[in-house]
Amino acid sequence: ADNRFGLKYWAGAKEPHTGQYFDSLEGKATSFSKRELETILTDSGLTDYQFYYPYPERWFPMSIYSDQWLPKKGELNQNLRNFEGERMVLFDEEQVYDELIKDGRFPEFSNTYLMIAGPERKDCPVYVKYSNDRAERFMIRTDILGDAAHRQVRKVPVSAEAVSHVKELKHWEEVLDVQYREAGLRANRCELKDGAAYFEFLHGRTFE
């Protein structure tokens, strides 16, 4: 569902249902805010639900966040992937997102929502990252699973060509483990299961 208070509509994107600027902000469209969607769910008798936050939008999300895994400062930097036609750029959305994240208000201004209603499912990821801007043989989806005490990483091929790439991750774990053993380093443990590669979840500093 589109969020009528999504940040891109403040920043100059057109309302997708009317094709006009600021319609959702002025109450002239059929989209809803997070609070309005929560009211619709509870009024329908659905008291168990989860919100997810596709980014940057719902058509071709690059990431999907959740209340258990919200974005960090500097992550929301792909804000001009607009599919509703022409738009204006009234301010730097990345900087505003960083301020919203710091203030704990990102969920209110997410451009769109994905809702799952019903008893909480333990198999749902808390975070999803799509790597589709690669050659097809390397296109994968990375999921972070589990609660804060039992995190796990799952890598899934999103194209037929990428199946072999995911299978090779186990091979390279073994190769690297041997190569760096004398240096006291070990590769992140990998397990192949149901067509996916599962890894330990490790905290560290990225060198990207």
Task: Explain the meaning of each model-derived region.
Residues 81-116:
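Conserved Class I S-adenosyl-L-methionine
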Residues 109-115, 136-141, 194-196:
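Short hydrophobic/aromatic beta-strand or adjacent loop that forms the aromatic wall/cage
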Residues 125-174, 200:
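ATP-binding glycine-rich loop module of kinase domains
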Residues 185-208:
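Conserved structural core of kinase catalytic domains
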Residues 27-53:
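Short alpha-helix
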Residues 50-86:
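Conserved catalytic loop of SAM-dependent methyltransferase domains
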Residues 171-184, 207-208:
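Conserved kinase catalytic-core helix
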